[in-house]
Amino acid sequence: MTTEQIVKAALKLIDESSLDDVSMRSLASELRVPVMTIYNYVASKEALNELVVDHALRQVEVPPPGEGSWEERMRQLQRGAREAMRQHPGLSFSRHGSSSREAMRLAEGAMSILHDGGFAPGEAEMAFATLFTFMLGQIELDVLSDSMGGGGEATFEGATGALDLNQDELFEVSLDAVIAGINLNLGTPANPRRGRTRGK
C-alpha cells in the first residue's frame, strides 16, 4: 500500500460521485483494507482532500519567462488549470482545493507572471484575485454544463429564450475580456492604465 494508491482510489470514487461523498470507510472498502490502514498513510479526510487536489493539479505547468507576453502565459496557465479540473468535476475545487500545495504553486506562478508583466505588487494582487475569481466561476459553470449532459454546451433559459453557448468558446472570450479589463483598469509601465482609479 502506498499514498499514491490511496489517492488514485480516492479519485476513482470521486469521479463516480463527488469528494464530499467519499469517506475514509468507503475508500478502505474500495481498496479492501481496514480503515486504520488508510489512516496510517493519510491523517484525515482534510488531508485526503488536499492530496487528491494536488494530484489533479500536478500536471498543470506554469509557462516560464520567455514564452510570450504575460497575457499569453496567463492564458496557457488558465487553460491548463481548467483542463485539469474538468477531468475530475467531483473535486469541487472552489471548496477544497485553494489551499493545497499544488494550488499554491500555481498561485505563485500566476503572481510571477504578473510581476514579469510589469504590475506593481498591489496591482498584481488585484489582477490575481480577478483571474482567480473568474476561474472558480468557470469551473462551476463547466461542472454544471457537464452534469446536465451539455457535452461542452451551456444552455441558459431566459426572457429572450434559450441561449446555447459552446463552453470552450465562452471560456476563451471571457478570459480575453478579463485580461483586457486588467490591462485597462490596472495597467503596467508598458501599458499605463486608462480606466478609473481604484476606489473611485
Can you say where each PLM-predicted feature lies in the sequence?
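Amphipathic alpha-helical interaction segments
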Residues: 5, 47, 76, 105, ...
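Helix-turn-helix
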Residues: 5, 9-47, 51
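Short acidic alpha-helix initiation/capping motifs at coil-to-helix transition points
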Residues: 26-29, 101-107
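DNA major-groove recognition helix of helix-turn-helix
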Residues: 42, 52-53, 128, 135
